[in-house]
Regions:
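Short, conserved phosphate-binding/catalytic loop or strand-edge motifs used
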Residues: 19-21
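C-terminal non-catalytic regions of proteins with extracellular/luminal or membrane-system context
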Residues: 4, 23, 27, 35-260
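Long, well-ordered, tryptophan-enriched scaffold segments
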Residues: 1-16
């Protein structure tokens, strides 16, 4: 199959015969390709919850707090085996870009908690959630936390042993929720993540969004794009709900897509 694909791509043809031979550096990272990357990212986003029509935010809220270890993290835009990119747009950058021409809307940002462990800054950063009109909480996994081989040397990295959202992230989210401000949870990852649905008022599963991810997420949050995605995998409530890994009977499991 690998060789078949290479033949179809014309990799064994002479440049003058290959229909791809005319492509060069000018065709890499073009405006058209970035626009396509943004569109694909938009359409992959899954809306899991939207209590009281919190989304889209549009211009309903004037003080927006962006928080979480994923918000300014380019690694949370990329899956494993990714290539190099000239420019990656983080979620924080996308949200700022969406509102920078609106003088009456302010954006604050706190990481709040670490990607791979507890943060000592947790206490004082939570106060900002209380003072905001709405919180956009960017949490989840990055390509190292679901990595393979070399990344698995560090204990936090490599294959996941549980499907739960990391405890330190969940604890911080819970503390932020107790402040009473509406929360839009933006989750990154490439597999099922278990978490309590009541942790946020609106929930978007955005996966690994790619180079235009921050812009695509901001488009959906502010209503310039519709989250059209569907879950390709089941999200169990907890690791305990999963059958034993050595059980190959496939009872109560199916390859079929179920609407409800």
């Amino acid at each position: 199959r690998l060789l078949d694909t290479r033949f179809k791509l014309g990799m064994f043809d002479s440049p003058e015969k290959s229909k791809w031979g005319h492509l060069g550096k000018k065709d890499v990272d073009s405006k058209e390709h970035r626009a396509l990357a943004r569109e694909v990212a938009q359409k992959s986003i899954v809306l899991l919850k939207n209590k009281d029509g919190l989304l889209p935010l549009k211009d309903k809220f004037k003080k927006i707090l962006v928080m979480g270890p994923v918000a300014a993290n380019v690694n949370a835009l990329l899956g494993n085996y990714n290539g190099l990119n000239s420019h990656l747009v983080t979620m924080l950058e996308g949200i700022i870009g969406k509102t920078e021409d609106k003088a009456d809307i302010s954006i604050d940002y706190v990481m709040g908690v670490g990607m791979y462990g507890e943060s000592k800054q947790r206490g004082w950063t939570l106060g900002q959630a209380e003072n905001a009109d709405v919180v956009v909480a960017c949490f989840g996994l990055d390509n190292a936390m679901e990595g393979e081989e070399g990344e698995s040397v560090e204990t936090i990295k490599g294959d996941r042993e549980t499907i739960e959202l990391p405890k330190w992230q969940l604890d911080y989210l819970q503390a932020a929720k107790e402040r009473g401000t509406p929360i839009v949870l933006v989750l990154t990852g490439g597999s099922a993540i278990a978490f309590p649905r009541e942790i946020a008022d609106a929930i978007l599963m955005v996966w690994y969004q790619g180079e235009e991810g921050g812009n695509a997420v901001a488009d959906v949050i502010f209503g310039d794009a519709i989250p059209e995605g569907h879950l390709p995998v089941t999200f169990p409530k907890s690791t305990e709900d999963l059958p034993d890994f050595a059980d190959y009977s496939m009872k109560n499991r199916t390859y079929r897509y179920i609407e409800k």
